[in-house]
């Protein structure tokens, strides 16, 4: 399928909108009440620091809603305002934040049901309005909705669209896209649908397996068993790993994406030599600015003397998980929560999700005496949620 031609055709359709409806002022008050925070503004103005009795809060200098998320949420609110009576769907969570998605449900936005990992579009009919979330949607989903006569409101983050353009260029030049991402993440599913030949690698460990195979150090059967669910149909590692381009899920850890890119550049240089390197490896630049800013701010924050860290964001949020990884890499006692409700100020307890584990309830969360708490949040977390966590910490520090 010529995905580029399909996108161009879709973008010219009268039933497609990716620019909003000019109703920003009409939804501004609702957005402010639901997501913004006066306290957070005050803390920003005070050098990202708050002192309250024995408690000191240090905020990361970049956190919370990124521009792409703000845009997607605002467009969703505008869509309901523009289509007050129409049946309104969304193909997935608008962003990885439970409170934001709950607000959409309260606005009678229906989420496409999922049965055994497969989306069921049978309830969507001609004339329905369907929102594509910030992560985007697969080209097959877009095609289905277009053919069904739906009105499509596309809130896909432009940084994600940039990655799609990158893998389409790879496809045009018969280059295999190595996608650094989580194979079942909505964004990676969408990106791979625009690619031609592709292989998804989760981390440096998997990237090294691919690099070793390119240099003749791997077993084909073992390789295919490892990556059978992470590659394009008909993928042949002996044929399809000779010309590579790297792309990424925009919320992955920036440093690891760059390291993976350097690994494959060295690998192709070793195999083909400097004279032929440009024929076998394509450099990339698909790292999201907002993701990079939040990770850089987190690295700066964990250099400060912190007693503990609270990371706020959806448990299925990739960018939030990577912020948690940064704290843990510095040996900081860190807690990942998805909503302020996880913190019980009366009992000094917190229900949190340790990395790669199930939820855990921890007592004696805030230690006695003077305590400095670092706080950051993922790109899908509104300031209001961060404010509520800080208010609970202030209350807890007084007890």
UniProtKB/Swiss-Prot annotation:
Residues where [4Fe-4S] cluster binds: 66, 157, 288
Q: Which InterPro entries match?
A: LytB/IspH (IPR003451)
The kind of enzyme this is, by top-level EC class, is: oxidoreductase
Q: Name one Pfam family in it.
A: LYTB
UniProt-annotated binding residues for dimethylallyl diphosphate: 96, 185, 317-319, 380
**Record keywords: Transferase included?**
no
Entry annotated with the keyword Translocase: no
Q: Which BP terms in the Gene Ontology apply to this protein?
A: dimethylallyl diphosphate biosynthetic process; isopentenyl diphosphate biosynthetic process, methylerythritol 4-phosphate pathway; terpenoid biosynthetic process
User: What's the stated role of this polypeptide?
Assistant: Catalyzes the conversion of 1-hydroxy-2-methyl-2-(E)-butenyl 4-diphosphate (HMBPP) into a mixture of isopentenyl diphosphate (IPP) and dimethylallyl diphosphate (DMAPP). Acts in the terminal step of the DOXP/MEP pathway for isoprenoid precursor biosynthesis.
Q: What is this protein called?
A: 4-hydroxy-3-methylbut-2-enyl diphosphate reductase
Which species is this UniProt entry from? Parasynechococcus marenigrum (strain WH8102)
Upper taxonomic lineage: Bacteria, Bacillati, Cyanobacteriota, Cyanophyceae, Synechococcales
């Amino acid at each position: 399928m010529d995905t580029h031609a399909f996108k161009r055709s879709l973008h010219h359709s009268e039933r497609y909108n990716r620019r909003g409806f000019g109703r920003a002022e009409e939804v501004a008050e609702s957005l402010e009440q639901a997501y913004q925070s006066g306290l957070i503004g005050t803390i920003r103005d005070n050098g990202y620091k708050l002192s309250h009795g024995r408690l000191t809060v240090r905020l990361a200098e970049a956190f919370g809603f990124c521009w792409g998320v703000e845009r997607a949420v605002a467009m969703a609110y505008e869509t309901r305002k523009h289509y007050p009576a129409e049946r309104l769907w969304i193909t997935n969570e608008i962003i990885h934040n439970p409170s934001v998605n709950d607000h959409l449900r309260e606005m009678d936005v229906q989420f496409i049901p999922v049965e055994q990992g497969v989306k069921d579009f049978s309830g969507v009919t001609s004339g329905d309005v369907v929102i594509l979330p910030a992560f985007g949607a697969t080209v097959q989903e877009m095609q289905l909705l277009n053919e069904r006569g739906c009105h499509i409101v596309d809130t896909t983050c432009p940084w994600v669209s940039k990655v799609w353009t990158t893998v389409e260029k790879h496809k045009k030049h018969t280059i295999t896209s190595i996608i650094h991402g989580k194979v079942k993440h909505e964004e990676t599913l969408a990106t791979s649908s625009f690619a031609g030949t592709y292989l998804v690698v989760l981390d440096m460990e998997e990237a090294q397996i691919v690099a070793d195979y390119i240099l003749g150090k791997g077993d084909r059967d073992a390789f295919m068993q490892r990556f059978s669910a992470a590659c394009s149909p008909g993928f042949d590692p002996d044929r399809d790993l000779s010309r590579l381009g790297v792309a990424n899920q925009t919320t992955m850890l920036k440093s690891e994406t760059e390291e993976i890119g350097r690994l494959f550049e060295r690998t192709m240089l070793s195999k083909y030599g400097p004279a032929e390197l440009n024929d076998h490896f394509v450099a990339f630049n698909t790292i999201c600015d907002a993701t990079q800013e939040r990770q850089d701010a987190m690295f700066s924050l964990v250099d400060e003397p912190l007693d503990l860290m609270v990371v706020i964001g959806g448990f299925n949020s990739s960018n939030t998980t990577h912020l948690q990884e940064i704290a843990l890499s510095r040996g900081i006692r860190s807690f990942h929560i998805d909503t302020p409700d996880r913190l019980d100020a009366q009992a000094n307890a917190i229900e949190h999700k340790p990395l790669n584990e199930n939820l855990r309830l921890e007592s004696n969360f805030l230690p006695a005496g003077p305590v400095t708490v670092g706080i950051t949040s993922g790109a899908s977390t509104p300031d209001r949620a961060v404010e509520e966590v800080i208010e609970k910490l202030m209350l807890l520090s007084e007890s």
